[in-house]
Amino acid sequence: MSLISALANVHHQGQFGDFEDKKGDDLLKISEKKNLLIVQIVQFKNSNIPIESIDIDGLKLKDSPLNVSFNDNTRILWNGPKNWLLVSSKKDLINDISLTFKETDFAVTDLSHSRAVIDIEGNHVIEVLKKGSPFNFDELKKNNSINSLYNNIAFTVDLLNDKPFKVRLFALRSFGESLYHSITDAALEFGYENK
């Protein structure tokens, strides 16, 4: 059995919108990110385990707003008080996570197949996000993440880089195509290339 990506029916390679005479970072690049391990980790209220003692792929959980812990393979996004979203290219990390987080203290949920993941890169990324979201993206810094809405679709934004801008967007798989259409529609003005 093969898996079908969340955007398989709508994401097609090519250049769209006002792409003529644009090169490098002036042309937005939009791609679907596949084959990621996505795990939600929530610490129970009655748990006494100090999160500072927990290590996953060399990273610590941090309970501070907007914070992202990261290395080359894994990013841990703060999702709320005692709530994190772990995203990794190392699919076998799920075994370590299962051993590290005891069921009596943490709820661990594999969300890998229930999310649509879109990467957007280029100089106009923030302008595209501003078109559909009420969040003030001018205040978002590199390696910060937020939860917000984009045209009434709940999504998570992870700012991977700021020179040039690169963001990773996460939405429920069932809203993936709608989010994708909203993002690509907003990107037409700047021109974009699907990879």
Language model regions located:
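Basic, glycine/lysine-rich polyanion-binding surfaces/domains
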Residues: 1-195
